[in-house]
């Protein structure tokens, strides 16, 4: 049973794509070298990766000479009147036209997303536009929901912090009230103690006066 035909399409995985590129590139360069050696052919191979890196092989001493030979055989000799500056101007003009086309396409897409200029669109384009709008709405809803959840979490955190601060303040106020009560009781005790000391001092003084008067009275009686 023969091998089935493999469908050629772009490899989606970036790593797999790079690995496949490296293997196929090396194989292609090897085949070009073998062809030039086995058949004594002049072979030139130019490869640019998707990142713009150049890989080349040339069986002759100069890639430029091989390219000039290729141009003579297929396109004729290059026009001598076209200077490097003119070539750059042409390249810049082409790049400008590409950018202009992309800009106009983006403008049309933006107008279509806003519901404008829908007349020229066919059914498939309208379906694609509808899918884009649905995806945009889903993304907007998801972003809005996440924003509301973040705000709710922030409010809960602030509420918890305020409750903690309120409890701490109440505890300090209670401690302050108890301290004031203790201080008031201490003042009362000191006041009572002071009064008692004063009364004792006055009682001692009065007793001393009474004793003194008694002694004086006894002497006066004796003198009489």
Curated annotation (Swiss-Prot):
Keywords noted in UniProt = DNA-binding, Nucleus, Transcription, Transcription regulation
Instruction: Give an example GO biological process.
Output: regulation of transcription by RNA polymerase II
Gene3D superfamilies according to UniProt: Transcription factor, MADS-box (3.40.1810.10)
Q: Which SUPFAM superfamilies match?
A: SRF-like (SSF55455)
Could you name the domain of life of the organism this protein comes from? Eukaryota
Q: Which segments constitute the MADS-box domain?
A: 3-57
Q: Which InterPro entries match?
A: MADS-box/MEF2_TF, MEF2-like_N, TF_Kbox, TF_MADSbox, TF_MADSbox_sf
The record's principal subcellular location, in a coarse class, is: nucleus
Subcellular localization, as worded in the UniProt entry:
Nucleus
Q: Name one GO molecular function term.
A: DNA-binding transcription factor activity, RNA polymerase II-specific
**Which Pfam family is one of this chain's hits?**
K-box
* Free-text tissue specificity from the UniProt record: Flower specific.
Q: Which residues form the K-box domain?
A: 89-179
- GO CC annotation: nucleus
PANTHER family, A to Z = SERUM RESPONSE FACTOR HOMOLOG
The UniProt function text for this chain reads: Probable transcription factor active in inflorescence development and floral organogenesis.
What is the name attached to this protein's record?
Agamous-like MADS-box protein AGL9 homolog
Which organism was this protein described from?
Solanum lycopersicum
Lineage of origin: Eukaryota, Viridiplantae, Streptophyta, Embryophyta, Tracheophyta
Gene from which the chain derives: TDR5
């Amino acid at each position: 049973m023969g091998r089935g035909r493999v469908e050629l399409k772009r490899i989606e995985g970036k790593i797999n794509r790079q690995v496949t590129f490296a293997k196929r590139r090396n194989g292609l360069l090897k085949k070009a070298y073998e062809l030039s050696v086995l058949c004594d052919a002049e072979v030139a191979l130019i490869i640019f990766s998707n990142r713009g890196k150049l890989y080349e092989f040339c069986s002759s001493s100069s890639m430029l000479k091989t390219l000039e030979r290729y141009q003579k055989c297929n396109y004729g000799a290059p026009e001598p009147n076209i200077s490097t500056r003119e070539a750059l101007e042409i390249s810049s003009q082409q790049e400008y036209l590409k950018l202009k086309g992309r800009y106009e396409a983006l403008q049309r897409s933006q107008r279509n997303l806003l519901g404008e200029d829908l007349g020229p669109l066919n059914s498939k384009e309208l379906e694609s536009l509808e899918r884009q709008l649905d995806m945009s709405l889903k993304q907007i809803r998801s972003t809005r929901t996440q924003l509301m959840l973040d705000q709710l979490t922030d409010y809960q955190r602030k509420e918890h912090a305020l409750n903690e601060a309120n409890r701490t303040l109440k505890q300090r106020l209670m401690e302050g009230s108890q301290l004031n009560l203790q201080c008031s009781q201490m003042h009362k005790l000191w006041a009572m103690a002071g009064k008692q000391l004063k009364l004792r001092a006055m009682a001692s003084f009065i007793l001393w006066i009474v004793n003194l008067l008694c002694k004086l009275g006894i002497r006066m009686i004796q003198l009489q």
